[in-house]
């Protein structure tokens, strides 16, 4: 039974990681307010290495629709500006000396729908990842029964427990998706 408990615990931990990754992906998509996490995934070239933007500059919220990026080194201004422009966020930074202001455009209905579509894709990818984790766990359990290390009753109970874990995590994904869709469609 210890092996089965370990398999269930492993499945739950892996599904938690998928859920956390989804939460981070959702945090990057902001509809109605500026937030520093919007630029978290942007990397810049710094002395030949790609590093996250927040390691070469201070990112702060100036107001509800503007982010301010202040590089720690003057020569990083054009590099950071280009990285923000070429990101898939559709932002146009404005540079004033060593300060880069990133105004967030007011979202059109079309852009909101596009963001909802992206959010749904992220949620579906998380669901698929969780189903794959369930499949891997069930496969491991089937291997144990082939090796006669557990009984068929143990197998059935373990598979039911893993299914409950999966259902719980997929329900959480659906709840996060509903909240995010509502957030994105608010004007």
UniProtKB/Swiss-Prot annotation:
Gene3D superfamilies: 3.30.1360.40, Ribosome-recycling factor. Signal peptide: none annotated. The gene is frr. This is Ribosome-recycling factor. GO terms for biological process: cytoplasmic translational termination. Keywords: Cytoplasm, Protein biosynthesis. GO terms for molecular function: ribosomal large subunit binding. It holds the Pfam family RRF. It is found in: Cytoplasm. It comes from Nitrosococcus oceani (strain ATCC 19707 / BCRC 17464 / JCM 30415 / NCIMB 11848 / C-107). Its main location: cytoplasm. It comes from the Bacteria. GO terms for cellular component: cytosol. Responsible for the release of ribosomes from messenger RNA at the termination of protein biosynthesis. May increase the efficiency of translation by recycling ribosomes from one round of translation to another. The lineage of its organism: Bacteria, Pseudomonadati, Pseudomonadota, Gammaproteobacteria, Chromatiales. SUPFAM superfamilies: Ribosome recycling factor, RRF. Belongs to the RRF family.
């Amino acid at each position: 039974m210890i092996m089965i408990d370990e398999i269930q615990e492993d499945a739950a931990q892996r599904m938690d990681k998928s859920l956390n990754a989804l939460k981070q992906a959702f945090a990057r998509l902001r509809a109605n307010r500026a937030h520093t996490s919007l630029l978290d995934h942007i990397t810049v070239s710094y002395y030949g290495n790609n590093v996250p933007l927040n390691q070469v500059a201070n990112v702060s919220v100036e107001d509800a629709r503007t982010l301010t990026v202040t590089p720690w080194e003057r020569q990083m201004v054009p590099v950071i500006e280009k990285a923000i422009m070429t990101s898939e966020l559709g932002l146009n930074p404005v540079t004033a000396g060593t300060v880069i202001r990133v105004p967030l455009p007011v979202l059109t209905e079309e852009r909101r729908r596009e963001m909802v579509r992206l959010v749904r894709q992220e949620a579906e990818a998380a669901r698929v990842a969780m189903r794959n984790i369930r499949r891997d766990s069930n496969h491991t359990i089937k291997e144990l029964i082939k090796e006669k290390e557990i009984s068929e009753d143990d197998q059935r109970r373990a598979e039911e427990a893993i299914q409950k874990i999966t259902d719980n995590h997929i329900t959480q994904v659906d709840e996060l998706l509903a909240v995010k869709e509502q957030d994105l469609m608010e004007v």
